[in-house]
Structures are given as structure tokens and as C-alpha cells.
A protein has these predicted regions:
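Asp-based, Mg2+/Mn2+-dependent phosphohydrolase catalytic module
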Residues: 2-13, 105-108, 112, 121-238
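Active-site neighborhood of HAD-like aspartate-dependent phosphohydrolases
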Residues: 2-51
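Conserved phosphate-coupling serine/threonine residues in phosphotransfer and NTP-handling enzymes
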Residues: 22, 118-120
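Short, surface-exposed alpha-helical segments at coil->helix boundaries
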Residues: 28-32, 59, 122, 126
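Short beta->alpha linker loops
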Residues: 29, 53, 57, 81, ...
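Alpha-helical substrate-recognition element adjacent to the catalytic core
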Residues: 32-76, 98
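Metal-dependent phosphoesterase signature
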Residues: 65-102, 110
Length: 238
């Protein structure tokens, strides 16, 4: 459909980036750290349990692992082990996802605020920011800084508030079902770039194989398109 005149001037007020699996190819590093923890606990992590962890907070991932292994271990000890092992890997092996660096720099160069919205805890995020460039972000929200982590909308609502943006004019870029649910519940427009788990298109999101070639005008077009969809009587795209 053609954009209504009221919506033609809509712009992206902020871009809210997930980190693991979206900006950084770090899910593979989490695989290694989680496998090491499972081994230390005397078991093997199932593929199903690992899929459930994608996009989860540290505490939720530990709970999933303990349940999967059928053990009653100390969550604090497991969390400390996992954090230490992940930190070792983050310091030496982080790499960018295709197109992520280019889009992040383009957003920054255009003067559009970027926020990092991650389920990873603050200490590990600070290590990752050495690779990402902390100067490129106007704000960051970590999994240990919210009461309700993803899939609750709190992380994305918090990020939008920190940069002074209306969530409906923010594009959230995510790779996981939990993160997408969080962003959509907050009212954001979502660009999904699946990493470990397949994501289907929906009226509230676009899906791309990677961020390669994605531009700020592309994100602005998504905001306008979703605004148009909300103005339809049935709330659906036409």
C-alpha cells in the first residue's frame, strides 16, 4: 500500500541492537562455555536445552542446564564458572556477524542513537564492548540490570527510554525468539536475523539472512511500513 501523508516523514528514532548472535558471532563461544560447564557438572547438554537458552539470561540458562542434566547444583557456582569461561573466550575469539559492523557505524555516522540490549551480564558485555566500540552506543542494557529479562518487554522499554525514543519508532535487531518477543511486546519494529533458531516473518517483523547490505533507509522504511499497518482497520498489512 502507499504510505499516508502523515507517515511519510517518520524516521528511525533509535536502533536497538541485540548482541550475541546479532552483532557478534558469539553463540558459538557460548556453545563452548556451556559444554565445558556441563562436563564439569558431570553431564552432556542436550541440543534441545541449548536451543531453549538462545537469547536467555545467565540465570535462566543455568536453570535450564541443571534441569536438563537432572541435577540440583548451586546456581551461583555454575554461574560463576560459566561467566569466567565465557570471559576467556570473549577476550580472544569474538568476531562480527556479517554486515553488523557496517550497519552499526552507519547508524552512528547518521547521528541516530544506538543502544545495546543484551541478556548477557554487564561484566561480559564490557569485554564485548572492547570489540564493538562502546563509543558507538548511546546506552546499553544488560541482563543483570533489569528485573524482568527477555522475553519481557522491560529491556527494550528501558533502552528506548534511555535514548529518549518512542519504542514504536525504534527498530530492534534480534536473532532469537525470546529477544523478538521482548522487542515486539515493547512496541518496537523488529528486524530478525536468525542465528541458531529459525524465525518466521510476521506483521511486526522483517526477516533477513544477515545484516549485509542493510541500510538506515531500509530501517526507516520498516518503521513507516509498520506505522501504516497499524492504521489499517484490521491492523494488518495490505
Amino acid at each position: 500500500m502507499t504510505s499516508t501523508p502523515a507517515n511519510t516523514g517518520l524516521k528511525v528514532q533509535a536502533v536497538l541492537f541485540d548482541m550475541d548472535g546479532t552483532l557478534l558471532d558469539s553463540e558459538k563461544l557460548w556453545d563452548l562455555a556451556l559444554e565445558d560447564l556441563a562436563t564439569a557438572l558431570g553431564g552432556d547438554l542436550s541440543a534441545r536445552a541449548r536451543r531453549r537458552m538462545v537469547g536467555s539470561s545467565l540465570a535462566r540458562s543455568i536453570a535450564i542446564m541443571h534441569d536438563d542434566l537432572g541435577i540440583d547444583a548451586d546456581p551461583e557456582s555454575s554461574g560463576a564458572y560459566l561467566t569466567e569461561r565465557a570471559a576467556e573466550l570473549f577476550r580472544t575469539s569474538l568476531v562480527w556477524k556479517p554486515g553488523a559492523r557496517e550497519l552499526l557505524h552507519a547508524v552512528h555516522a547518521a547521528g541516530v542513537p544506538a543502544a545495546l540490549v543484551t541478556s548477557t551480564n554487564r561484566p561480559l558485555t564490557e569485554i564485548a564492548l572492547d570489540t564493538l566500540g562502546r563509543e558507538l552506543f548511546a546506552a546499553s542494557v544488560c541482563g543483570d540490570e533489569v528485573v524482568h529479562p527477555k522475553p519481557h518487554p522491560e529491556p527494550y522499554l528501558t533502552a528506548a527510554a534511555l535514548v529518549g525514543a518512542n519504542p514504536e519508532q525504534c527498530v530492534a535487531i534480534e536473532d532469537s525468539p525470546l529477544g523478538i518477543a521482548s522487542a515486539e511486546a515493547a512496541g518496537c519494529v523488529v528486524l530478525a536475523v536468525p542465528s541458531e533458531v529459525a524465525i518466521e516473518p510476521a506483521p511486526t517483523r522483517s526477516v533477513r539472512d544477515s545484516l549485509t547490505g542493510v541500510t538506515l533507509p531500509d530501517l526507516a522504511a520498516m518503521v513507516r511500513s509498520w506505522s501504516d499497518a497499524r492504521t489499517e482497520p484490521d491492523g494488518q498489512r495490505t
